[in-house]
Swiss-Prot record:
The gene is Tshb. Indispensable for the control of thyroid structure and metabolism. Keywords: Disulfide bond, Glycoprotein, Hormone, Secreted, Signal. It comes from Rattus norvegicus (Rat). Transmembrane segments: none annotated. This is Thyrotropin subunit beta.
Length: 138
């Protein structure tokens, strides 16, 4: 009995190390433009989760590309565009944002991802909120 339990625990740990848990995850973002009367609340999906990484000893002898670690990033995504209500006529009221369709563990691509550890902006509204209910897409 003990051998079966031990084997099960070891097997579960091995599977957990091999598989990554990098998946599209629901995320709520707030779009707040200084010139517009309202803050827009958008429900979208982002890539979030765990990717297996290893810290390599002997970093001095390795090329720089071998030192970067995998992050949970977009495999496939699309952009959606919404209109922020209450903007004056001289202000472009449109805001585009990515929607994760599928994710992967890989190198962070700064062309379409924020590769910083923590976001610089805070995610909250300073004005009355309105919710995006769909309809306009780019």
């Amino acid at each position: 009995m003990n051998a079966v339990v031990l084997f099960s625990v070891l097997f579960a740990l091995a599977c957990g190390q091999v598989s990554s848990f990098c998946i599209p995850t629901e995320y709520m973002m707030y779009v707040d433009r200084r010139e517009c009367a309202y803050c827009l609340t958008i429900n979208t999906t982002i890539c979030a989760g765990y990717c297996m990484t290893r810290d390599i000893n002997g970093k001095l002898f390795l090329p720089k590309y071998a030192l970067s670690q995998d992050v949970c990033t977009y495999r496939d995504f699309t952009y959606r565009t919404v209109e922020i209500p209450g903007c004056p006529h001289h202000v472009a009221p449109y805001f585009s944002y990515p929607v994760a369709l599928s994710c992967k563990c890989g190198k962070c691509n700064t062309d379409y991802s924020d590769c910083t550890h923590e976001a610089v902006k805070t995610n909250y509204c300073t004005k009355p909120q309105t919710f995006y209910l769909g309809g306009f897409s780019g």
